[in-house]
Regions:
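A generic structural signal for short, solvent-exposed coil/turn residues
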Residues: 16-18, 100, 146
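N-terminal subdomain of nucleotide-sugar transferases
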Residues: 1-55
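Extended catalytic core of nucleotide-activated donor transferases of GT-like folds
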Residues: 30-33, 45-132, 140-144
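Donor nucleotide-sugar binding/catalytic pocket of nucleotide-sugar-dependent glycosyltransferases
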Residues: 115, 131-162
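A broadly tuned "polar low-complexity/structure-edge" signature
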Residues: 6, 87-88, 161-162
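Histidine-centered active-site/metal-ligand motif
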Residues: 42, 111, 157
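Residues at the starts of beta-strands that form the adenosine-phosphate
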Residues: 23, 43, 105, 134, ...
Length: 162
């Protein structure tokens, strides 16, 4: 199930040239989810940035095709195919800034909900304007809650039973 989900995300991205294996730039977000994504066989390159989440190996070991980059190093020579942002709470902004120089497809995948009543409305409005070339939510409820105002897709979280 998760492999078809990733194939859906990739097809939405309209990456210029179809490949058997993509190089995907991301930031550690959700170890179990990213472990499932790694089972697709694509190569994930995860930024190791000060003040950002690190991979928690007590939750999951790092998959062989999930690479933690050297601290504060983009390693742009890797020629990434697209960027995968998994949070509008700080991660999107960092990856969007990086993409100003890389200029590659940007996928915004949101695992969380806006914090209505806990965050100022203007902060939520700013986050609603954070959109990628492709925008994915993990549920219809999340998609509706964010109300980003552009075309978006729902790909439900999968469960690996193997």
């Amino acid at each position: 199930m998760i492999n078809s989900s990733v194939q859906q995300i990739i097809s939405f991205a309209n990456v210029a040239k179809k490949k058997d294996k993509y190089k995907i730039l991301t930031i550690p977000t959700h170890e179990r989810y990213e472990t499932q994504l790694s089972k697709t066989g694509h190569d994930f390159y995860s930024l190791n940035i000060d003040q950002h989440k690190k991979w928690n190996t007590s939750q999951c070991p790092i998959p062989d095709n999930y690479h933690i980059l050297p601290p504060n190093d983009l390693c742009s020579y890797l020629n990434y195919d697209f960027i995968l942002s998994q949070s509008k709470f700080g991660q999107f902004q960092v990856l969007q800034q990086i993409n100003q120089s890389l200029r590659i497809p940007f996928i915004s995948l949101e695992h969380t909900l806006p914090l209505y009543g806990l965050q100022p409305a203007e902060n939520i409005n700013v986050m609603q304007s954070m959109i990628g070339n492709v925008n994915v939510f993990i549920s219809e409820f999340s998609q509706s809650s964010w109300n980003i105002g552009v075309d978006s897709h729902v790909i439900h979280h999968g469960i690996d039973t193997k």
